[in-house]
Amino acid sequence: MFAKLHGKKQRPISSINSQTPRTSNTTHANSISLSSGNLIVGSNRNLRQKKEQFGSQQRASGRKLISNKENDDNVNNGGDNNYDNGERVHRHHIPGLKIKAYQAELGYHESRFSENLVMLNLVEFPDIKPGDLVELKTYHKNPSASNGDKKIYFIAKDFDGETKRRAKTSNVSILSGQLQTLLDLPSRSRIWIKLKPNKFDLQADVVEFNIKDCLLNRGDMWVLSSKLVDTCVFMDQRLAFLDSIRGTIKGIYRNGKKIVSGYIGEQTRIIFRSESARLIFLIQITDEMWNFEETGEQLFQKMVNSFFPKIFKKWKDVDTHHTITIAFAISMDLSDTSFKDLTPGESLKNSQDYFRIVVDQVSIIHWVDIMETLREEFMEIRKDLLNKQTDKGYSVANGRFSPVIKSNFLELVNFATTILTDPFKQLDLRHTTTHVMIISPGSGLFDVDYSLLRLTGKKLLSLEMTMDLICLSKAPLHIVPLFRYRDFENKLHHCVPLWLSVFFWNDHDKKSNSEWTPRCKIYDLQMMGITENELIREVDVEYLQLNKKVKSLSEFMNDYDKNAFEVKILCAGSNTKQSKKLNSKFDTVFENDVVVKARKIPATATTTHGNTKFIWRGPKVALPAIKDIQKPNVIPDLSIKTIEASFYDDCNTTNDKISTPTTSNNDNLEMNDSLVSVRSADNQNTSLALDSLKGLSKRNSLKDFTQRVITKFISNIDTSKNKKIKSTLLRDDVDNSPLGSNTPLPSSESKISGLKLQQKGLADENVISKRGNLIIKKNLSIFGLPSNEIMSGSPSSYLGSSHTRTSSKLSNMSDKAAFITEGQKSKHDDSNTYSLTQQLKHRISETWVDIKSPSIPVSSEFANELLPIRWKDVWPKYVARKYSKWRSFTTPAELPITISDFPSKDDFDRNFIFRNHSVTLNTDQEQYNQTYKDLLRDMIYMRLLTGFQICVGRQVEKIELSRESGESETVVNKYLDFNQNDAFKLYLMIDSEIHRITCSSSGIIDVERYLRKDEANLFDQVPSYIPLVKTRYESSFRDAMIDPLHVKRESLNWNQIDQVLAGYGDNLIDRKWHGFRAKYVVLPTDIPPNTYSMVINGKSETLNPEEIRVEGLRRLIGSITRSRLRTEKEKKGRKTKREEIQPEVMFYTGPLYNFINEQQTSLESSAINFKDSIFVNDNNLLNRNVELSKLAYQIQRGEDRITLVNRKWHWKKHEKCFVGSEMVNWLIRNFSDIDTREDAIKYGQKVMKEGLFVHVLNKHNFLDGHYFYQFSPEYVMDTNKLEKTNSHRSTLSDPKQMLRKASTGSSNDPSAMTPFSSVVPAISASNASVADAKEPSRPILMLSNSLVIDVDPAGKSSKQESCTVHYDRVHNPDHCFHIRLEWLTTTPKLIDDLVGNWSRLCERYGLKMIEIPWEELCTIPSVNPFHSFVEIKLAINPWEDPEFKDRELFAKSKFYYHVYLLKASGFLLDNRASKFLQNQDIEFDIMYSWGKPQFKYVQYIHHTGAYVAELRENGCLFLAPNNIYISRVNPGNIIGKIHSASSSSLDAQKVILNFKSTCLDYQKLRSIFLDAKEMWITGKIVED
């Protein structure tokens, strides 16, 4: 029934209970199989476990839970006897309670009548009440695969009046649309309705919600999840929040099944997946990337011809809108010796890392170009790195590509984390989450540095980054991913990182997965060209002969497997005859009496064929023939009553050869002391295979190689007939594991000690005295045997030595309590072992888990512990990981908002320090209808934004319960759920920091912060690391401008942030912190044809392009000011005159300082007049009947006069004029009968017609905008008096007062004060406050205004959505107009919608609004090493070229030619350098409302918005693509190769390549410079 939902080729997870296992059945416990790129290990037991019984710990959430049992025999009219369709019954039976199933008739209703999905006529269903959970089941007599029976859950709602009237016979009505399509039933169909009284048992485990083309941060995910609680959803249901955030339900899981519909409760985990994410592919370029597989395909070609096309196809099928970044990660080995000389776990000593950025944030629409670029770069990378130019110009080979096992894996992971270290970086409002995919030619085994491993794991605990490893090789026969490292004592360890998921790419038919393929690759041997015939001649191994006791081959195989893998548990004194009888079946010897007997084993002869002689040894513990490849973990038998708390330590499990006791003919236990041995330090890491392969080449024949292997094999065998095998046979000549060895301890330390066992029936006391009174058995949990047959233990505690700074002291302690669980804690509470180990376990399990023997398969329980701790909630329980593989690649998940991991109580009490602070809401916020609940929500919201997760689960409940003595029940909240009888309590955690937030009805919010104490600074233990980087358009590698290893997420001052959220932002101490920020510029573009003419008051006005764009900017500012955040009182009151008055933007042409010097008086008076004289006394108000002479006097000489100034526009100067918009504002302020701008325009046109004033060019009527008007000569006041008055007013202006009033723009009056008006502006304008405090000697001129606006004027959001806007007061139409946004807890999608509205408004007036980086361009490479840029040195240096060198010109403008080149190429001025603003001979300081400008270089923006350019002091140009805008403007869906890209897409690469070719072409550049020279000679005019 899932065929329609998931496509034809996707295999659904059955919704019907099945007794078959969820994973592939394997032959035995040690088997490993590869299925769809996933390594499946372990037994054939069903992975599904029995569901937890919640019992008495149900939360007091206000919803009463009823537990009962259904009785499906009471279906009306006979019904369907199999109604539950295999559903598990979880309810307890309540006698006498029967749940009826009602047959009903289906009807449909339209959305215009009701938005409810399902409605019932509750009169006909007496036991169903509004709000109950109800199940709807369809019925088909002959259900098919495409149209089977479906179950839909919904919340009961009664028919409304209109539905009752329209539905004559139907008693169930469903909303037409999605649900109707899913059910696929005609009207009046028969369905079944049944009450589900126990919501808690039926709630879904996981619900997956896909979003696209929007940024949904984790705070909003928490808010939206809370809105979905106590609702029902169905597959492919489209949901909308705030009428803006839209998503689709793509997965509903319960009890390991994917179901069609489900109920969402508080325990349901809602996972948000992104269809528009930022994907980063890091491709490891190692020596193996040029290797060929057995199929003849090169690994790199396998990646570009198989993996990438398949994943692009997946993206196209899902219709994703991702942006992708692809980089090569290379580690070059520059040492003189081969890496084979290094021991396992040892890193390269002399290496250099390179990162080549192939593409950066490119839309997947350009996938064809991406693949071509990828192939070209791979062809060039070898030549670029292996060839080194000598001083004489020769090219010599230098270094070699490192093997993948010795590559820079952790370094590249840290390189990827650099883009996420700042949680308040400028956001991409169209993409959610960042997903890293590392493509490796290896098989998941890496040698890493111990200190760097600790640092990397620590760093990733605080970042919201998902990471997948895709291996191009076949899956190995060991646990993956696997890291080898050497600790500070040079001991070798194997570990599995908990922050990395691994997949093996195999594009062949899935049937081939069932075929056996060799996993050991000896590439040099394979490439020697030896044919099969030559191989047969060199290595001649004859066939084996089976024991004649075996009657059939199948019987022999079954018995062998049973004996090998179903190891019996031998208790002391047990009868071992049965074991002896079974084992003797397979004991054989050589015919020539060469006896191989490592233990006392009864031998029986076998017949042989020909002269072949071989041995079958009974695999009592699957002991390898050549060496001890996998060491079974052993533990004492817990049935023994007295055991000391200190178990045997690490040296015994790692280096001792302890085998399962077997019985000899005398039924005696023998544990040969000679099994303990000590290896020399020089030989401790020698591997047989590695030793044999060293130096293997065509000069060393295969025959020699084979002889060496056989010699190694039999070197320790004593060929004497009657001699037993001596202790040298199992001397530790080889590694203890297939991948390496631990450094052994002295034999005196290797003895098992400290174990006092009391057991009767043990044999030989001599053996006991040597080994201790001990019975040992295998750790059978790793083979998946039932837990009741072995010790019940937590698999997560299967850990190795400590990885903290106290590693050497605590490593043994970790192993001693390796399998102690919560249930056994009471047995060992007498010692400190448990608490210390639990602390250690938690610390280690956050980042990695040590593995004793990587080749031993792990149990399913232990495999679950290998999931990333912070990401565990993403995966549904009981569902195989392979079902989520492609979802991780196509729709990566964001970090879940919840985490179930929490420190133990002992760890929490002992190892955390306590800090606390309290927060109360500022009373000023009450006028905006804010309460302490809103503050509490914002505090939690902000923590989720910075990576915190809400703690849930039993452990955090236990911690909270231990705090509340005397209370029988404790609730730790997940969502905002206030209970009158209880305080709100919520825990959040990130890395080693835990916050406990509590709030009661008093309104005081307490924050308790717990910080892990005595943590070593891991960043001090790792040296600096500067790799070489080559971005997309660079021609050579250079040093990176960032140290990827030492970049981390800084801790935040949460006390300060909480005070800011509460409304106390004026008292900030740390001025470096800021909220979220975005910068936009408005650029001129093509004007729509129908915009040139405008009809104003019935009169047609024709405007030129410049006037249209200026008018567009005024409309934009008007839209911003009308969005001012209002108090509740203002919202209820009438619209006032104040709202009709707009702040003026002063437009100018020519140099900025000329305009400021000319208009300084106007700039000062405009700020003062707008603030202080916004209203005059009612007695002085005029009306429309005023005489023109009196009106002229009031305008020019009244108290609230208009300043007449000389204005220059381009090259024309206009004497003593005013601007139309300025007159409109004056009329509204001073006339009692003019309340709107429209009224003011009509009156202005009237007095203009009467001759009061005229347009300076006699071109326009009176208009509201930037149009110049002059008074008619008869109405002009005395000039001398006017100038004297103006001068007097200028001297009265107080610079400090002007700073304070102008810095907040139009929001400085009380009506504009908002919750963040004193917060965000105060944060950003910190330098202004500092300057004010230092009593500046010069007046400060503010060139921008700020205003706090309401982003949600319709009130759709449940929280206040506000944002601070900074916009220019002074603007040149030939430059960029700037708008900056700052916010804290505002929903980003609402910001995006607001910007979209502004952008559409601009487009109507020939303007384009684009987003650019907030910081200046030169700082980007120091925070984002992936960002591409190019530095261009001009082909002509005009400062030195005789043709263009002009001292007079350069004295006025040193960069005249450079600026002309940029303008001629379509670049517009963005930011001026701070040096330019500070070094001029002026009488004031330049400031902005967002802070003091700190730009090092002048910056330009290309008119397309695609590129940003900087002009350096040396005359070079520094350019970088504006990725944040390019990814926004380009459509994201994939287009086929035969189709061209959309015409609306922006080809940013073409822009930069054309400009670069112009700058490097002498003739093109000379032509442009000649035009610039001619303009200078003609006009002698130099602009900014």
Swiss-Prot record:
A GO-annotated cellular component: Seh1-associated complex
Compartment(s): Vacuole membrane
GO MF annotations in UniProt: GTPase activator activity
InterPro entries according to UniProt: DEP_dom, DEPDC5_CTD, IML1, IML1_N, WH-like_DNA-bd_sf, WH_DNA-bd_sf
Phosphoserine modifications at: S680, S737
Pfam families registered for this protein in UniProt: DEP, DEPDC5_CTD, IML1
GO biological process: cellular response to nitrogen starvation; cellular response to oxidative stress; intracellular signal transduction; negative regulation of small GTPase mediated signal transduction; negative regulation of TOR signaling; negative regulation of TORC1 signaling; positive regulation of autophagy; protein transport
Keywords: Membrane, Phosphoprotein, Protein transport, Transport, Vacuole
SUPFAM superfamilies reported for this sequence: Winged helix' DNA-binding domain (SSF46785)
Extent of Low complexity compositional bias: 74-84
Ranges of residues in domain DEP: 1198-1273
Residue stretches of biased makeup (Polar residues): 12-37, 738-751, 1303-1312
Function: Component of the SEA complex which coats the vacuolar membrane and is involved in intracellular trafficking, autophagy, response to nitrogen starvation, and amino acid biogenesis.
Record's miscellaneous remark: Present with 279 molecules/cell in log phase SD medium.
Protein family (similarity comment): Belongs to the IML1 family.
Name of this protein: Vacuolar membrane-associated protein IML1
